[in-house]
C-alpha cells in the first residue's frame, strides 16, 4: 500500500513537472518571442532601450524554452519508468560566468568537457594553453549549435569572457574585499548574479541574431547609439510593425 501511495505521488509530481514545462515553453517563452522577434527582425528601426530589453528577455526566453522542453521530457520519462539527466540547474542563480556554464545545458557542457577540454589538456597545463583550450571548447560549442558564423562568434565571445574572468579572478577578489558591499553578502550575491546575467545576455546578441537572421553589428550599433526618444518611441515602432503584420492583437498595448 505504501509503495502504491509513493508511486502515485511521484506520478502526480511528474505530471506537474510536465505541466510546468508546457507553461514555461508555450505560455512564457512563446509569448516573449513575439516581442523579441519583432525587435530583432528590424534592429535598424529599433532604439537602444528596446534592443536592450529584447536582448535581456532573449536570455530568459531561451532558458524557459530549453528547460521547459527538458521538464516535459523528464516528467514523461519518469512516468514511463525512466530517469533522464537534469540539463539545467537554476543557471541564473550563478554568481560567475563559469558558474553559469556549469548549470546551463549540462549534457552538452559535460560532453565538451570530457571529449574536448580534458583531452586537450584542460587546466593541467600552462596558462596560455589553458586559455587556448577554453577558447577552442567554446568555439566548438558555437559550431555545435549551427553552421553559421554568428554561432561561432557567440562561442568565441563566451570563450573570451571566460578567459578574462579566469585571468582577473585574483584582482576581482581584492576589489570585492575592499568594497563596502563585501560586508553585505546578500547585496554582493545579487550584484554578481546581475553582472553574470548581463555578460551572458551580451553574448546572446550573436545567438539571437543567428536565430532571427539579424546583423549583430546593427544590434550593437542600436544599443550604443539609439537612445533618442526612450522606450516609448521604440515601442511605437514595434506596435506599428505588429499592426502591419496583422498580429497587433497578440501584443500588449502600453
Can you describe what each PLM-predicted range is?
Residues 1-7:
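Positively charged, low-complexity/disordered segments
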Residues 8-252:
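Membrane-embedded transmembrane alpha-helical bundles that form the catalytic cores
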